[in-house]
């Protein structure tokens, strides 16, 4: 990146207005190859002429593309010619992929420069403990106990490509680049809509950039509506849908309500609304009444249909009551458990009973989802019955055992925060018996005979690491008792989800 820094240091007035000429600079293609494709897709590069090139950068194919872009008539090729000449069709599909990657790199330049200017002179404090996934659950345990409802919204897509082009138009002021981008999408892509699940495999950087810009556009408007939620019942928010004058209308809207309605600013505004985006979903936790939650639901429906022109069925917005329904988040099923508590109180000669309800945060393991992930990876069948791992029988005994022990410890480490360990013990049982069946299959023996010979050694391998961790946290007398069955342990060294946990 430092090698090309001199090429990218143009003044602030030009960096947003003249991105189109960068498509005709060879060094940008080198930058895209080194910084993008070599990192995201190491096994396959669209800047390589063929496999005999030993995956080296080809300047010849870049020169051909630039020459075609200068000669606009040569860049436009009828669809009939693509079918008649498969070599030409493949080449133009390759050109389209190159342009899409390059567009993502070029448009990221003003975003990265503006982000760097915003953090210039500021010191960002780093807390490695807060990087752990488990650090979120103490926050949920503290906050969710005060909430009643959770709004679970599935972010709708596919979305029409023209909406994405208009979204980029608000941030990239170069009309030539946007016209060229639209031309490439409709000329070579021939798509009617945008579906990241189907197309992200072809070009991850490009489609992730489009998806993130789409989400950024949505959240920028939603956060404004959330801050001004006290006015939504009386004022239609369709007036904000033209984003060219969006910020001016925000300022005008704020002045009108501050001057004319100062007493109603906090009537319907919810200060306890928490928002998170996870796995293509929006999750809103609040202490509102069912009536206000239904209002938020219809606001979401109208918002997506009016602004993004996407049909959004009401079934994709679920209102869950935390005391009855579970919130699926980061591999756990979280809910609130109401524990009735009876307290006997006595004043002088009179005694009476007081009924209290204690709200407790409950985190459970989604056993059906985990068994589905185990069945998908051939550790068991769909009913949860362990089977042998046939693809691992060619490995050594120690390698097979270490693989199972490592998976078992990681899952046990991640799900140590569950309220009840019954489902965790079931997962361990599946992995242990799968390990035994795999080793027995390798040695062409029965499970019973193999356990008689090496059963104690297998149990020691599976249990030693877990006992060492627990002995550092609790005294021996405590973790050997039944109380450990109900203790939740949150670790601060978990930075990513295991594949079996990340089942969605």
From Swiss-Prot:
InterPro entries: Domain_X, Maturase_MatK, Maturase_MatK_N
Keyword NADP: no
Compartment list: Plastid, Chloroplast
Molecular function (Gene Ontology), one example: RNA binding
Pfam short name (any one): MatK_N
Alphabetical keyword list: Chloroplast, mRNA processing, Plastid, RNA-binding, tRNA processing
GO biological process: mRNA processing; RNA splicing; tRNA processing
Disulfide pattern: none
Entry GO terms, CC: chloroplast
Annotated family: Belongs to the intron maturase 2 family. MatK subfamily.
Annotated function: Usually encoded in the trnK tRNA gene intron. Probably assists in splicing its own and other chloroplast group II introns.
Name of the protein this chain belongs to: Maturase K
């Amino acid at each position: 990146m430092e090698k090309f820094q001199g090429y990218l240091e143009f003044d602030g007035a030009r960096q947003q207005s003249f991105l189109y000429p960068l498509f005709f600079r060879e060094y940008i293609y080198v930058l895209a190859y080194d910084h993008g494709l070599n990192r995201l897709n190491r096994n396959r590069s669209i800047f390589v002429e063929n496999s005999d090139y030993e995956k080296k950068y080809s300047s010849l194919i870049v020169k051909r593309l630039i020459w075609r872009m200068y000669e606009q008539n040569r860049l436009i090729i009828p669809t009939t010619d693509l079918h008649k000449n498969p070599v030409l069709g493949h080449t133009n599909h390759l050109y389209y992929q190159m342009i899409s990657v390059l567009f993502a790199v070029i448009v990221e330049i003003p975003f990265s420069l503006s982000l760097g200017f915003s953090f210039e002179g500021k010191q960002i404090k780093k807390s490695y403990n807060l990087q752990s996934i488990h650090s979120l659950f103490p926050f949920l345990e503290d906050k969710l106990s005060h909430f009643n409802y959770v709004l679970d919204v599935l972010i709708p897509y596919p979305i029409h490509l023209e909406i994405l082009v208009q979204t980029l138009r608000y941030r990239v002021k170069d009309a030539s680049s946007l016209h060229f981008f639209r031309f490439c999408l409709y000329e070579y892509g021939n798509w009617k809509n945008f579906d990241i699940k189907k197309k992200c495999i072809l070009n991850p950087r490009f489609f992730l950039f489009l998806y993130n810009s789409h989400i950024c556009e949505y959240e920028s408007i939603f956060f404004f509506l959330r801050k001004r939620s006290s006015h939504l019942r009386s004022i239609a928010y369709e007036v904000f849908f033209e984003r060219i004058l969006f910020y001016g209308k925000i300022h005008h809207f704020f002045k009108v309500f501050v001057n004319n309605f100062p007493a109603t600013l906090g009537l319907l505004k919810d200060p306890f609304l928490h928002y998170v985006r996870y796995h293509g979903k929006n999750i809103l936790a609040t202490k509102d009444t069912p009536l206000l939650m239904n209002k938020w639901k219809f606001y979401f429906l109208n918002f997506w249909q009016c602004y993004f022109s996407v049909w959004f069925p009401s079934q994709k917005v679920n209102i869950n009551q935390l005391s009855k329904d579970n919130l699926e988040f980061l591999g756990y099923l979280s809910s609130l458990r109401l524990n009735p508590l009876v307290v006997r109180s006595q004043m002088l000669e009179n005694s009476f009973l007081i009924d209290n309800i204690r709200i407790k945060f409950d985190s459970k393991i989604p056993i059906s989802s985990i068994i589905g992930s185990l069945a998908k990876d051939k550790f068991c069948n769909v009913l949860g019955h362990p089977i042998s791992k046939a693809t691992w029988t060619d490995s050594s005994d120690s390698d097979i055992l270490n693989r199972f022990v490592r998976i078992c410890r990681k899952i046990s480490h991640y799900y140590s925060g569950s309220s009840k360990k019954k489902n965790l013990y079931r997962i361990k049982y599946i992995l242990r018996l799968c390990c035994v069946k795999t080793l027995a299959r390798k040695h062409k023996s029965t499970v019973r005979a193999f356990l008689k010979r090496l059963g104690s050694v297998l149990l020691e391998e599976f249990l030693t690491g877990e006992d060492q961790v627990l002995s550092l946290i609790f005294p021996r007398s405590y973790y050997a008792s039944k109380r450990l069955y109900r203790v939740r342990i949150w670790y601060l060294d978990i930075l990513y989800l295991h594949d079996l946990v990340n089942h969605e």
